[in-house]
């Protein structure tokens, strides 16, 4: 009888110990909102106002919490984004703000982006809090060529004086597209538009995609199109 009681006590002890151990390591399904909310946890509101005098429109995108209060989305880096579009529906300016309406620096880099369009070309400028063109790490402006479908083909980098500058070891990039319209190849370019090794050690980055366009593989080539390695271990 004593042995049976002893075995029962041991069994109960092990069961309780196991239960406590499971509870101790069980992941907390609750979210720590002390650091803020992600965009997926917030309501997204979109409002568009027409400006008949300027033949343009302003679309305001706002993140709201359950109390319908404007709220910072920690994964986006802003609470409010405003987009200015021209009569053709092309975005010509984008700015970012906090919940109080103050300009914010996106990615600790820039406060807004300005787009200027020409025939098969777009000029992209990065803006400071006052709406002036500002320099990033190396460049302040991208001159982008577009194909007939409006897709980005070539990007070239320039400073505030519109002088060509290097970024990641190149002066620009060229994009190729497959039959489905997916970008399947990026070539890094020197000042003369020829392939050059980027700072990662390759000149061409090829993408393998599935039917839905998801990247399933990457390949690195040198300036002659021969396989090579990435210096960053990709």
Regions found by a protein language model. Give the residues of each.
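Hydrophobic alpha-helical membrane-insertion segments, chiefly the h-region
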Residues: 15-26
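Buried hydrophobic residues that stabilize the cores of well-folded domains
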Residues: 26-234
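N-terminal Sec-pathway targeting helices
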Residues: 2-15
């Amino acid at each position: 009888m004593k042995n049976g009681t002893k075995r029962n006590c041991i069994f109960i002890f092990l069961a309780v110990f196991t239960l406590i151990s499971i509870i101790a390591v069980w992941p907390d399904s609750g979210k720590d909102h002390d650091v803020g909310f992600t965009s997926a946890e917030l309501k997204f509101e979109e409002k568009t106002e027409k400006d008949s005098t300027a033949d343009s429109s302003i679309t305001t995108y706002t993140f709201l919490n359950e109390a319908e209060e404007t709220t910072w989305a920690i994964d986006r880096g802003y609470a409010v984004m405003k987009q200015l579009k021209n009569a053709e529906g092309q975005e010509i300016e984008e700015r970012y703000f906090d919940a109080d309406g103050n300009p914010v620096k996106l990615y600790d880099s820039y406060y807004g982006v300005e787009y200027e369009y020409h025939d098969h070309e777009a000029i992209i400028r990065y803006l400071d809090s006052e709406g002036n063109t500002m320099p990033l790490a190396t460049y302040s402006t991208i001159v982008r060529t577009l194909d007939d479908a409006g897709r980005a083909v070539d990007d070239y980098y320039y400073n505030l004086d519109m002088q060509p500058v290097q970024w990641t070891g190149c002066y620009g990039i060229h994009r190729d597209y497959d039959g489905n319209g997916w970008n399947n190849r990026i070539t890094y370019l020197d000042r003369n538009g020829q392939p050059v090794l980027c700072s990662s050690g390759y000149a061409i980055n090829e993408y393998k995609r599935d039917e839905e366009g998801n990247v399933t593989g990457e390949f690195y080539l040198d300036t002659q199109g021969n396989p090579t390695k990435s210096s960053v271990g990709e």
